[in-house]
Every structure is written in C-alpha cells, then in structure tokens.
C-alpha cells in the first residue's frame, strides 16, 4: 500500500515503480532523505509479533512458493526447492533496511504499530491487503492511496496484485435440517440480494464475483481489477499449501532473528 502524496513529495510517482529494482532505488532514496521529508522510513515496521508476523511468514512467503509452483506447473508439493528464496531475501532485506525502526526492534512491533506509522504519515509503503481500506480511508482519500504489486524481481512486467482467500463459509452438517437450509438461504441472500451485496461490498469491503453484485467502493479492489484488465497476472495465494502453523512460526522466528542480526539467513 502506497501513500501517493508522500511518494510525490519525495519526487516520484507510481510510474517510477514497475520492478523490484525500481522499488529498491526509490525506497533507498527515500530512506536516505527521510529527515528532510519529515518521515521515519520508506517502509512501515515489519513487525514480527503475533499480530503482524503473518504478513511475512505467510503472505510474503507466498511469493517464492507461487513462482516455484508456476515454473513447475503444479499447485502443491511435498517440499519446495527454494528456487526463489534469494528474491524473498531481497524483499525482506529492503523492508528491514529502509524501515521506520531498527531490525532489532521488530520482534516487539505490532500490526497496530505498522498501521499507525502509515496513518500518521511516517512511511510511504506498507505491506498489507485490501482489508485495511476501511481504516485507512478514515485518514486518506482514495486519490492518496494506491496498491502496487510486491515486485519480486522474477516477472515484474507481468505481475499483478496478490489475490486470494483462506477463509470460507461452512455449514455444520450436524445441525438440524431446518437450520442447515436456513443458513444456506441466508448465505445465498448475502451474495445475491441488493441489501446483502451492498452490505458486503460497502460495509465489509469484500469482492463479490457475481454480475448482479454491487460494485465495491474499496479503492484497492478497484485497482486490482484495473491491473487484471491491463493484462497483468494476479499472484495466487498458494500459502494455503504450507504444512502447518508450526511451520510458519518456525519461519517467523528465523526471520525475526535474522532481522535482529542474531541469526543467519540460512535458518530462513
């Protein structure tokens, strides 16, 4: 997520960022003149406490998995080869180097810390998703916000936004037949009726993939559609194939130690 106003204050526009190399060049420059710009860093803190670490042990970790799966033409595997771990390191290095704080502080930084840094204008870039729109819209107008791909240095010219879901509606099969049917009817109403789709779109910020649904007011969702219409390829969420939460926690611990300078990238 990008603060376009701060980006322009630094002398850049979105057109200047079309690849990882571009992003690094811009972020490094912003970091070098952060005091003159009146900010604390190019990126908000990559918080590694439990409220925030999922952004890096899951969502950022999705990128090397996605590109490996894409290259091999698969959608799951027993073990990744690690083909794109160097690119993963490059992005994480950028996050912790061009940051609002020192890497040693990230273990205690929270999701609220990162959001507040962005809301307060302390940083230009903030890795998060469309679900943050409602909070950010309290401070910024749509014209001030943009979402750009997490450029990974692999296929940047064709890369769109990372899109997907890991949440699903489920109905308890052990409930009464009457309750099961009532639940299914309600779920159908939510995604087909005018009131239901309006609530899900405007109040909840969801994308509803049906022609009759209310168009989303969420500017990030609109921008995702624009990227896709322009021919860019959405990055699918393949992190749902990660073995377990324990696996992700181990990765998170390794990332935290690396950021603090007390652990090697080899552990990652």
Feature locations, PLM:
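A structural signal for short loop-to-beta-strand junctions that line the ligand-binding cleft
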Residues: 1-7, 41, 156-162, 233-241
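Short helix-initiation/N-cap motifs at beta->coil->alpha
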Residues: 18-24, 105-120
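Extracytoplasmic/periplasmic solute-binding protein
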Residues: 24-77, 123
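Glycine-centered hinge/linker elements that transmit conformational signals in sensory
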Residues: 26-28, 72-108
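Short, solvent-exposed loop/beta-turn-alpha elements that line the ligand-binding surface or hinge
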Residues: 47-50, 65-90, 138-139, 152-161, ...
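Paired acidic/hydrophobic, glycine-rich loop segments that form the ligand-binding mouth/hinge
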Residues: 124-129, 146
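Extracytoplasmic/periplasmic substrate-recognition and gating elements
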Residues: 138-203, 253
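C-terminal capping/gating helix-and-loop segments adjacent to ligand/active sites or protein-protein/ligand interfaces
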Residues: 163, 206-209, 224-268
């Amino acid at each position: 997520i990008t603060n376009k106003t701060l980006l322009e204050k630094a002398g850049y526009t979105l057109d200047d960022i079309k690849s990882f190399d571009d992003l690094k060049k811009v972020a490094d420059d912003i970091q070098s003149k952060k005091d003159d710009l009146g900010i604390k860093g190019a990126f908000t803190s990559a918080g590694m406490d439990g409220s925030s670490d999922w952004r890096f042990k899951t969502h950022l970790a999705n990128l090397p998995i996605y590109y490996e799966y894409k290259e091999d033409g698969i959608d799951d595997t027993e073990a990744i080869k690690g083909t794109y771990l160097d690119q993963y390191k490059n992005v994480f290095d950028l996050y912790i180097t061009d940051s609002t704080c020192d890497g040693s502080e990230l273990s205690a930084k929270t999701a609220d810390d990162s959001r507040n840094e962005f809301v307060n204008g302390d940083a230009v870039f903030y890795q998060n998703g469309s679900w943050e729109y409602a909070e950010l819209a309290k401070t910024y107008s749509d014209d001030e916000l943009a979402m750009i791909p997490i450029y990974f240095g692999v296929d940047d010219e064709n890369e769109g936004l990372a899109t997907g879901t890991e949440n699903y509606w489920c109905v308890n099969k052990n409930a009464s037949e009457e309750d099961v049917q009532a639940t299914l009817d309600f779920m159908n109403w939510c995604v087909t009726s005018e009131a239901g789709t309006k609530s899900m779109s405007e109040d909840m910020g969801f994308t509803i993939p049906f022609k009759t649904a209310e168009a989303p007011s969420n500017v990030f969702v609109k921008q995702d559609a624009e990227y896709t219409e322009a021919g860019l390829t959405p990055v699918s969420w393949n992190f749902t194939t990660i073995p377990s939460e324990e696996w992700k926690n181990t990765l998170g611990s390794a990332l935290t130690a690396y950021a603090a300078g007390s652990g090697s990238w080899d552990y990652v």
